[in-house]
Amino acid sequence: MNAEKLLSTEQLSVSVGHKVLCSRLDWQVAPGQFWCVLGRNGIGKTTLLHTLAGLNRPAGGRVLIQGEDIQSASAQQLARLRGLLAQQQADAFSSSVLAAVIAGRHPYQFGFGWDMEEDRALAMRALEQVRMAAFSAHDVMHLSGGERQRVALATLLTQDPLLFMLDEPTAHQDAAAQIVVMELLRHLPPQKAVVAACHDINLVERYASHVLLLGDGQVWQGSTDSVLQPEILQAAFSCPFEVVENGSRRLFMPIAGVS
């Protein structure tokens, strides 16, 4: 694996009001890595992800993308280096699915920004990857939540950044679609990396190479095997977990009625 850092933080502190989400975090993401950000509801996964993407200014420290401070990069530079998938998509007006996905090529267009045949081919390929090619002529306003989220992922694929940043990429997806999404992210080209906020610990165990786990005033980071340990999960979620071995995989089950 290339040891080059795509994304890194130096003494990063993130807060909302008086609540400190993380303090003096040193962390790095290398090409080929699939990081999942875990933590209970309201712990600050989305806020941290937005800070890492350059949308929010940190309370302290720096976020670096390819060694440069993310706050000093232009919007076009950022769009080519990192792409962000939000939890939900807010469509202000009607558009075909294909047109929405072609919009991912905007960072590479010049002049009037007319899309080329190559852009359309890339968009259709991305729709095929997320199993939405049959919907290319449909109106995005008429899609289900899960379908719209997969179209947004196709847009991100068409944008083709080095760093894929996703806020709950399996949200609104049925079981089969969750596997499609996670398999796709795991098999991105090796020069790319993924940072995804997730809720499903068992999907994380199956697909992530690394985990960043947020707790109250504490952060655990490292390989998936090292972070996903019952005692660490209990500390982060205030809930005990039972681990069931299933061949080479582990299944994590919260234990009801125990605190």
Q: Which sequence ranges carry the predicted segments?
A:
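The feature captures the beta-strand-to-loop junction immediately N-terminal to the Walker
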Residues: 38-40
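Helix-to-loop junction immediately C-terminal to a conserved catalytic motif
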Residues: 53
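Conserved ABC ATPase signature
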Residues: 113, 139-143, 147
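Conserved switch/coupling elements of ABC/ABC-like ATPase nucleotide-binding domains
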Residues: 212, 216-226
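Conserved ABC transporter NBD signature motif
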Residues: 61-69
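Conserved ABC ATPase "signature" region
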Residues: 102, 117-135
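Catalytic Walker B motif of ABC-type/P-loop ATPase nucleotide-binding domains
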Residues: 164-168
